[in-house]
Amino acid sequence: MIFSKISQVAHYVPQQLVTNNDLASIMDTSHEWIFSRTGIAERHISRDEMTSDLAIQVADQLLTQSGLKADAIDFIIVATISPDATMPSTAAKVQAAIAATSAFAFDMTAACSGFVFALAMADKLIASGAYQNGMVIGAETLSKLVNWQDRATAVLFGDGAGGVLLEASKDKHVLAETLHTDGARCQSLISGETSLSSPYSIGKKAIATIQMDGRAIFDFAIRDVSKSILTLMAQSDITKDDIDYCLLHQANRRILDKIARKIDVPRGKFLENMMRYGNTSAASIPILLSEAVQKGQIRLDGTQKILLSGFGGGLTWGSLIVKI
């Protein structure tokens, strides 16, 4: 049988840094108010870079690190809710920029679960035997979707990209997975709704910026994500003691605290970087993974079991246990 494994990781964030004090100068908030509620102190904001620009930086790094030629890449999946345009896909722009002429490319839209969903799909593509190498990138410029007068959401989000290179392997590395969607709760977190207007009717005005029912999302993350992780471990016979690190979507420090208690895993196993990047949606997990590799916490030698878990708009949530 053929399986997939993560062979390279990379990340990139825009240069512009925006601190909580910077935000306090343009809206009614303070560093203390933001940090005590979220664990976020600063975030990176794109000035003149689009989502594809961030993703291209990651793709270039993955190629350089791997030593592969671009035409050896079979597919590129970009997980994003902030694409450059409705079409072409952000992934198509990445494919062109790195000259991966043999690759097919498409975007995955699953909000903050996007990277986990895309990684699960990529694993199946390689397991089919038809493809050998693929890139999965989470990239966002959420600053373009934020209402900068709404302190309930503007303080949360940042821009960035992270990704992995997957290659075929004789050994199984994606050990367990669970993916979920509940569209009945979709209105809890929305952005970029299309207007219903046409030449024949005038419908409701489009909602362009991020709007969130914070309490509903907080409760959902603690209840549904915790339950799905516990179920995943039980069904796969992987215990909490087998897990070396937990890399969850970087939405809010309080959410991580509560999930750690719910699943009874030591808080020290939960890596985090939201303090420096904020919520980067589909990019948060791969950025966190890339930094953990840079720091030597995760070794990419196939000896560690890592829990990856994303959750967000849709509502969507999903987890993978991977051997890295």
Swiss-Prot record:
One GO cellular component from the entry? cytoplasm
* Catalyzed reactions: malonyl-[ACP] + acetyl-CoA + H(+) = 3-oxobutanoyl-[ACP] + CO2 + CoA
- What Gene3D superfamilies does the record point to? 3.40.47.10
Catalytic residues in the record: C112, H249, N279
Cystine bridges: none
- What EC number(s) does this enzyme carry? 2.3.1.180
- The keyword Transferase is annotated on this UniProt entry: yes
Q: What keywords tag this UniProt record? A: Acyltransferase, Cytoplasm, Fatty acid biosynthesis, Fatty acid metabolism, Lipid biosynthesis, Lipid metabolism, Multifunctional enzyme, Transferase
> Care to name a GO molecular-function term for this sequence?
beta-ketoacyl-acyl-carrier-protein synthase III activity
List the pathway annotation: Lipid metabolism; fatty acid biosynthesis
Database matches in CDD domains: KAS_III
A Pfam family name for this chain? ACP_syn_III_C
Q: Where are the transmembrane segments?
A: none
InterPro entries of this UniProt entry?
Answer: ACP_syn_III_C, ACP_syn_III_N, FabH, Thiolase-like
Broadest EC class assigned to this enzyme: transferase
Question: Can you cite a GO biological process for this protein?
Answer: fatty acid biosynthetic process
Q: Where is this region: ACP-binding?
A: 250-254
Which cell locations does it reside in?
Cytoplasm
* PANTHER family per record: 3-OXOACYL-[ACYL-CARRIER-PROTEIN] SYNTHASE (PTHR43091), BETA-KETOACYL-[ACYL-CARRIER-PROTEIN] SYNTHASE III, CHLOROPLASTIC (PTHR43091:SF1)
Give the comment on domains. Answer: The last Arg residue of the ACP-binding site is essential for the weak association between ACP/AcpP and FabH.
Instruction: Describe its partners and assembly state.
Output: Homodimer.
Family as reported in the entry's similarity comment: Belongs to the thiolase-like superfamily. FabH family.
**Known role:** Catalyzes the condensation reaction of fatty acid synthesis by the addition to an acyl acceptor of two carbons from malonyl-ACP. Catalyzes the first condensation reaction which initiates fatty acid synthesis and may therefore play a role in governing the total rate of fatty acid production. Possesses both acetoacetyl-ACP synthase and acetyl transacylase activities. Its substrate specificity determines the biosynthesis of branched-chain and/or straight-chain of fatty acids.
Q: What is this protein called?
A: Beta-ketoacyl-[acyl-carrier-protein] synthase III
Protein's organism? Streptococcus pyogenes serotype M2 (strain MGAS10270)
Organism placement in taxonomy: Bacteria, Bacillati, Bacillota, Bacilli, Lactobacillales
